[in-house]
Amino acid sequence: MEYIKKIALYMSVLLLIIFIGGCGNMKEEQKKEANTNKTDSKEEKIKKSFAKTLDMYPIKNLEELYDKEGYRDGEFEKGDKGMWTIYTDFAKSNKPGELSNEGMVLYLDRNTRTAKGYYFVRTFYRKDKLPDRKNYKVEMKNNKIILLDKVEDPNLKKRIENFKFFGQYANLKELKNYSNGDVSINENVPSYDVKYKMSNKDENVKQLRSRYNIPTDKSPVLKMHIDGNLKGSSVGDRKLEIDFSKRENSHLSVIDSLDYQPAKVDEDER
C-alpha cells in the first residue's frame, strides 16, 4: 500500500512538472507571436504609408498631378494648393571608389500649374576629390520634357528629352501582397525600413532592365525607406529603391520618390 502511494505521489509530481513546463513554453510561444504581430503591424503600416502615392502609379500623364492633392499638415499656408516633387535616378559603381548617378527631379506647382526641374549627372569619389556635378534645366509642357539648357552631347540630349520617371511606367498596386519583409525601425529619428526580394519576372524589374544598362542577372531587392511620421508629413523623407547590387561594396540601383509639400519654398531647398 505504501509503495502504491509513493508511485501515485511520484506520478503527480511528474505531471505537475510537465504542466508547468508546458505553460512556460506556451507563454514563450505567445510572446514570440506577439512580437511577430508587432513587426507585421509596422510592416503593414509602412506599406500603407507608401500606398498613398504608389497606388497612383503608373502616372503616364504627369499633368494629372495638378488635380491631385496629397497629405496636408500645418506646414501649408491657407490657400496653398501644394507642390508635387517627382524624382528618379539610376546609380552605379563604375569602378572601386567611384559612384555615378543620373536622373531627373521635377517640381509640379499646383497653384500655377507649371512644372520645372533639372536633369542631373553626378560622379562621387571616395578619396579626397570633389564630386563632379552638372544640372540641366528642364520644364514640362503637355506632358513633354523640354530641355532649356544647351547640351552638346547628342546622346545626353536624347536621354534628357526622352526621360521617363519610374512612376510613369511602374505598377506597384500588388505591394499589399508582399509579406515577410526584413523590417528595421529607429523610433528615435523616427525612421522605418522594409526590404523585399523581387523576382526577375516582375514587370517593374523587366521595365527597368529594358531602360537601363543593368549587367547582372541577380534578382533585385525592393527597399522602402521613410524618415518621419508614418501617417504622413510634408517635411519627412520617403523613397523607394530597387537594388540590383551584386555585393556589398558595389552599387547598382534605381531610386524613386514622389512627395507632396508646400509650394512656397526657397529655391535653395529644391
UniProtKB/Swiss-Prot annotation:
<comment type="similarity">
    <text>Belongs to the staphylococcal tandem lipoprotein family.</text>
</comment>
<dbReference type="Pfam" id="PF04507">
    <property type="entry name" value="DUF576"/>
</dbReference>
<keyword id="KW-1003">Cell membrane</keyword>
<keyword id="KW-0449">Lipoprotein</keyword>
<feature type="lipid moiety-binding region" description="N-palmitoyl cysteine">
    <location>
        <position position="23"/>
    </location>
</feature>
<feature type="lipid moiety-binding region" description="S-diacylglycerol cysteine">
    <location>
        <position position="23"/>
    </location>
</feature>
<feature type="signal peptide">
    <location>
        <begin position="1"/>
        <end position="22"/>
    </location>
</feature>
<dbReference type="InterPro" id="IPR038641">
    <property type="entry name" value="Csa_sf"/>
</dbReference>
<dbReference type="GO" id="GO:0005886">
    <property type="term" value="C:plasma membrane"/>
</dbReference>
<protein>
    <recommendedName>
        <fullName>Uncharacterized lipoprotein SA0405</fullName>
    </recommendedName>
</protein>
<dbReference type="InterPro" id="IPR007595">
    <property type="entry name" value="Csa"/>
</dbReference>
<keyword id="KW-0564">Palmitate</keyword>
<keyword id="KW-0472">Membrane</keyword>
<keyword id="KW-0732">Signal</keyword>
